[in-house]
Amino acid sequence: MDKQQEFVLRTLEERDIRFVRLWFTDVLGFLKSVAVAPAELEQAFDEGIGFDGSAIEGFARVYESDMIAKPDPATFQVLPWRAETPGTARMFCDILMPDGSPSFADPRYVLKRALARTSDLGFTFYTHPEIEFFLLKDRPLDGSRPTPADNSGYFDHTPTNVGMDFRRQAITMLESMGISVEFSHHEGAPGQQEIDLRYADALSTADNVMTFRLVMKQVALEQGVHATFMPKPFSEHPGSGMHTHLSLFEGDRNAFYESGAEYQLSKVGRSFIAGLLRHAAEISAVTNQWVNSYKRIWGGSERTAGAGGEAPSYICWGHNNRSALVRVPMYKPGKTGSARVEVRSLDSGANPYLSYAVLLAAGLKGIEEGYELPPGAEDDVWALSNAERRAMGIEPLPQNLGEALTLMEGSDLVAETLGEHVFDFFLRNKRQEWEEYRSEVTAFELRKNLPVL
């Protein structure tokens, strides 16, 4: 037994923790959990916990359903909303086959595989997400319009702003679980919040994002509201993104930094961005996996820009340009370790493991193939005409999930990154979602057409 496992078992005894929740994520990014008693944990570290993989979205067929969840002791944390005695803790799991080999259906393994390839190239991949979400007074299940929890706007600080107390309690919980927070504030739409997590290695960040979502929903329930990570719940307000800053390090050196280069951006950094741009359309179905995701991307960002609504619609990059898909942020002089790129397409409903894996694969492809970075866009891309964008070589992102899936289906990069099992399941599941949406007669159609046709 290693020291981390010993620490977990000792902590369970010292803090009177009677329940240990073992977490993992299905292919669509939904959190799954099984609780074990502390007495069973030593065996779980050695052998894992068996479960029916065919009951988990995208994991296995019924005739090959036996799977194992093996806890990762490095992810052990006590759940702060179960602080009373006896307490409850959690660990993330790796999903294995009965013979002990990794399950190709496990999103965490998909990311681990991508990170192993990155390590072979001499890099460490870091990510830093800015997570937006809405607080709602209600959560109607009949499809009717929800009500935001407040009427505040961008950076508003008012006594009636429910978000202030919410963010304070949520951040306290996150930090008690070892998840560091950099910033928090009210976003541009009524009820919309943003909390930015401190950068970490990509696997830790993905685990943190999954924890973050549960903490937000838990705190919201305690405060009598509801938290949603739906990309765009209101047609007239900005949607919720998960802008993510990416960087590669070689040891302690930031591989994106080069003194004297334009924007201090190294050849590695420029090729990484070029890879993100070249493969942006084909990875879009992963980073923006819901029908609703494309309402955020194409839902009038030019009208809501400056109010937190800068969702990118076009494939381009720019220096400090929030209308671009990829932004090279400014950073303070001397802070060379802060050199990074920001991808602005992700929404807060994405599976972080799969999203980080395909973003990394796209960037590494640019490095390995020596992609040349096209000229940057320093103007407001939304304000340009279609002809002006075409002249600059700026193409649009997919208009909807169906278009994104068609591009993904033809992508060798996405297929290789996700692996055959996840790739095939994802396409089947999302095609079904798209077909259901296409055949749905919407309230918009009834409202517009029924009175006049």
Description of each model-found segment:
Residues 1-453:
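Glycine-rich, acidic/polar active-site loops that bind/position phosphate-bearing ligands
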